[in-house]
């Protein structure tokens, strides 16, 4: 039988369930697929299939993640659900599962718990801008006033971390009831309402091709008589012959150049798109003026920096990380896009040391400038092995 072609007819959005352990994230994920499967818009997954998520390796870090996909009337969704709290921390910091928006699951019976807060904080740090709330286990609460109280608490918590808590959609229901009675219109109504809110509230993300052009440089060589070629994979945007671009990073100054040719697999292109592996011929650039680790970018779109705050997950010994803690002034390599740059770290006040398995905010000062913006991912390496993974949360200078 021929493979089914992926029909890209609906806009695609990446989402995930977040929230405290045992508040019902996985049950809700199963309920969504089961109910949409009735309409032919998903493959139904049961709780066990999602819960036994396979291990994945992302930048050397082991993460358990379940991926399901489904459709609503308007959209195609890829949805991630993680069995363990540590998996969420790793997922969100490494960017293994990029989320355009999240469904925060809170038990109406328990209210917000420590991981509820931690996941909201992580979402705000790593650039997940949109959260829709599902107040689960509502069937276990007899007093409607209690549900109102929990709703108020959740809104306050969202406000505290910079989300618009007062305007955030909150849907009340029971994921288990919906999962057990997929033909009962009343039981499944909260799930349908939730998906309608997700459709309406989480905007369709900007496609990579619509963003400003950026290509991390992987290699540089000279073609006699024609000039210097920089190769790499276009991360975002488009590039046409004749475009002016900037060479950013590894130096204090930014150089402007004109692209006189674009090639892919030795074929000449008029233009390159996000995802293409290309060689860009640059006019008037000497071989020694450009190096791996820099980026080619649309003029004015990105700047070089060497001091920033990052949220970092430190690998455990079992993940191939350090066996011992590190302290203030630790000087590892920070791997951005295509290159390692040495940097020193400053821990937050009152933090003496960082243990393998911790996640923490740290201020980093690099010895050379790197082209960076908020939410840029990096790895921390020692002698070529990854010992941590991080995301830039704010730039200092």
UniProtKB/Swiss-Prot annotation:
Residue intervals of the tr-type G domain: 10-206
Enzyme Commission number(s) from the entry: 3.6.5.3
CDD domains tied to this protein: EF_Tu, EFTU_II, EFTU_III
Highest rank taxon of the organism: Bacteria
Residues annotated for GTP binding in this entry: 19-26, 81-85, 136-139
HAMAP family: EF_Tu_B
Name of the protein described by the UniProt record: Elongation factor Tu
The species this protein was found in: Clostridium acetobutylicum (strain ATCC 824 / DSM 792 / JCM 1419 / IAM 19013 / LMG 5710 / NBRC 13948 / NRRL B-527 / VKM B-1787 / 2291 / W)
């Amino acid at each position: 039988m021929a493979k089914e072609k992926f029909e890209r007819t609906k806009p695609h959005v990446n989402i995930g369930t977040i929230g405290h352990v045992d508040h019902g994230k996985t049950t809700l994920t199963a309920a969504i697929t089961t109910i949409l499967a009735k309409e032919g818009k998903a493959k139904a997954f049961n709780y066990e299939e999602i819960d036994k998520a396979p291990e994945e390796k992302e930048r050397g870090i082991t993460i358990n993640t379940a991926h399901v996909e489904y459709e609503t009337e308007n959209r195609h969704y890829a949805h991630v659900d993680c069995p363990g709290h540590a998996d969420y921390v790793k997922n969100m910091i490494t960017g293994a599962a990029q989320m355009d928006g999240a469904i925060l699951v809170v038990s109406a019976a328990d209210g917000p718990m420590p991981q509820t807060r931690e996941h909201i904080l992580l979402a705000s740090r790593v650039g997940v801008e949109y959260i829709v709330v599902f107040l689960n286990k509502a069937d276990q609460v007899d007093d409607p006033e209690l549900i109102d109280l929990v709703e108020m608490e959740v809104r306050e918590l969202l406000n505290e971390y910079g989300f618009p808590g007062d305007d955030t959609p909150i849907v009340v229901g029971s994921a288990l009831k919906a999962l057990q009675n997929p033909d009962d219109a009343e039981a499944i109504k909260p799930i349908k309402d939730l998906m309608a809110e997700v459709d309406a509230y989480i905007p369709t993300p900007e496609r990579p091709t619509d963003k400003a052009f950026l290509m991390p440089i992987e290699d540089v060589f000279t073609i006699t008589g024609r000039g210097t070629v920089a190769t790499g994979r276009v991360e975002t945007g488009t590039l046409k012959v004749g475009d002016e671009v900037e060479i950013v990073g590894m130096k204090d100054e930014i150089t402007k150049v004109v692209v006189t040719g674009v090639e892919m697999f030795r074929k000449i292109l008029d233009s390159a798109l996000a995802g293409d592996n290309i060689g860009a011929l640059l006019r008037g650039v000497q071989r020694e003026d450009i190096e791996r680790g820099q980026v080619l970018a649309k003029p004015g779109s990105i700047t070089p920096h060497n001091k920033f705050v990052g949220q970092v997950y430190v690998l455990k010994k079992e993940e191939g990380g350090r066996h011992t803690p590190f302290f203030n002034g630790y000087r590892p390599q920070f791997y951005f896009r295509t290159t390692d740059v040495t940097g020193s770290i400053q821990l937050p006040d009152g933090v003496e040391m960082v243990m393998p398995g911790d996640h923490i905010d740290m201020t980093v000062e690099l010895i050379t400038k790197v082209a960076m913006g908020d939410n840029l991912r990096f790895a921390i390496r020692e002698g070529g092995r990854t010992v941590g993974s991080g995301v830039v949360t704010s730039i200092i200078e």
